[in-house]
Amino acid sequence: MAIEKLPPQLANQIAAGEVVERPASVIKELVENSLDAGATRVDIEIDKGGSKLIRIRDNGFGIPKQDLSLALSRHATSKLKSLDDLEAIMSFGFRGEALASISSVSRLTLTSRTETQAEAWQAKAEGTEMAVQILPAAHPVGTTIEAVDLFFNTPARRRFLKSDKTEFTHIDEWLKRIALVRRDIHFTLKHNGKSVRNYRPAMTEIQYLQRLGQVCGKAFAETCLHISCSHNDLTLSGYLQAPGAASGYCETQYFYVNGRLVKDRLVNHAVRQAFSEYAAGVSPGYVLMLELDPHQVDVNVHPAKHEVRFHQSRYVHDYILQALQSAMAQSSELGLEAQPEPTDESGAAFESNSTNSNVSSTSYSEPNTKPVAVNERPLTTTATSYNQGQSSYRTPLRPATHRADVELPSQSSLEAYASLLSRSSAEPASGKVVSNPHASAVSDASVKMPAVLADKYWVIVEEDSIRLLSIADVIKETARQQIQAKLAQGLVGQPLLMPVAVPVDDNWNEVIETREILLRKLGIELSIRLGQLIIKKVPPYLRDSQLAVLIPELLQWIRFEEPSDDALVHWLTTQASSRFTASAEAWLAFSTLDSSAKSALYNQSQELPWQQWMKESQSD
């Protein structure tokens, strides 16, 4: 049989087999075109599950009269001009197939008007006719597309459509998905003349939580954790079902890449792996939005654009994993039960009784460094902050030797604690009452942890004094003693789940060879391969650090000198100080300190002039 070129109408119908699967796919293509056209409102109207009528109306830029015919032809688009554009796609559509495919299997009417046109124009096309009629029409700025009698000319395809209810369910589900990621758009949906959905623009977080509740259910919206993190050119935001609220399989699983809803096994694996520590075998709900350089992701790998291919898939996987693990660990350590966390100017989080929202917020930030990393763990900035001075991922390799001034809590807060001493003996204050300030009974493991003030201090109430003991100082001293005891025998390195890779420097190979014994003593295992420094193992004290920055700084340091054990202990202590929390864990760690360290820390605590406050209060 001779090879012949297919007629345009037949070619369009073949293409429609991939693009137009059911009414929901028609609505997907048309609404995405509306969003690409800058619409802020999209109205969807369907009859009989979309098989009889699909009408999409938007207030976008519109299509000029001279482009109407071209818009209904194959491979005609305003989204791409060159191959470079294909490598960095940010729009939903880019192939120029949707309108041609839809018009080949339905009776399509396209009415549009641009802001510069005095009147609107209408284009009509039917599946059996390739000719397009252009007529004047009345229409505001924007576009309306009607697709009537879907698959009227392909009876076999029409027989495969499900019931009206089933087809409507697919449409409703797709609308929910797009409503979650495009919070700035007003979406409405009518079925058989009845208003079914009305998603108003969600410009504030409270409004978005209301939309989240509409789409995912009130239970999810009230118990989810807010995720917001950024690292280099990657930004992850959204909501994750709290471990305590998840069980079995949750159908609320939406993942977006640069605003495009995709299905990716890599993401599902990262979420399940992050959850395994808290609830093994659970597939939790999530609404996650990943933004990255469009050059780092290929969206042109699936006919319906449901899948993407990341250029650094392992990097993306581990980035999502670490972000979710950090969020859940933080919520667990702070004892959060889906409560919001307002932050002060330094980024420290405080407990709140706000009733505006039940979503726990977790945020991350990182300086603008440029390593090509495969596995990096972001450090939260809303964690319980007793190392308040740190505002980025890492601490300097050579921290300043002087101690920063500690900001005291407000006097009104302290006066509240002063009132503890005025209570009767029948109502003892929380904390340990001791007669000897140098007695180590205050740190007895059997003693209940004292009250915590501003996530920075323990309030130690004695017979005749109130003292503030810095949690940061306790954590630092605890880590220092542990590291000092273990460094003499050598630290044990822990393999990383995914090795970290950074571009290699010319002299690093020599440094690794000459300082091999020192690196082994620190529990750090490195190798160089294909121009990359591969970080394989680190001691537990460094696992929460930004390794892609920290290890190169370490190599630069030991290149010119061999640090003493004291210097190494000081460096490791600085990195490890963020591993603890202002909780019973830190208090228990305090009890492991020797008596001299406890006394030294106690002497550094700040005594409050509560008696003077009482006198001033009585005189007033």
Swiss-Prot record:
GO terms for cellular component: mismatch repair complex. Residues 378-394 have a biased composition (Polar residues). Keywords: DNA damage, DNA repair. Residues 332-402 are annotated as: Disordered. It comes from the Bacteria. GO terms for biological process: mismatch repair. Residues 352-365 have a biased composition (Low complexity). GO terms for molecular function: ATP binding; ATP hydrolysis activity; ATP-dependent DNA damage sensor activity; mismatched DNA binding. This protein is involved in the repair of mismatches in DNA. It is required for dam-dependent methyl-directed DNA mismatch repair. May act as a 'molecular matchmaker', a protein that promotes the formation of a stable complex between two or more DNA-binding proteins in an ATP-dependent manner without itself being part of a final effector complex. Belongs to the DNA mismatch repair MutL/HexB family. This is DNA mismatch repair protein MutL. It comes from Shewanella piezotolerans (strain WP3 / JCM 13877). The gene is mutL.
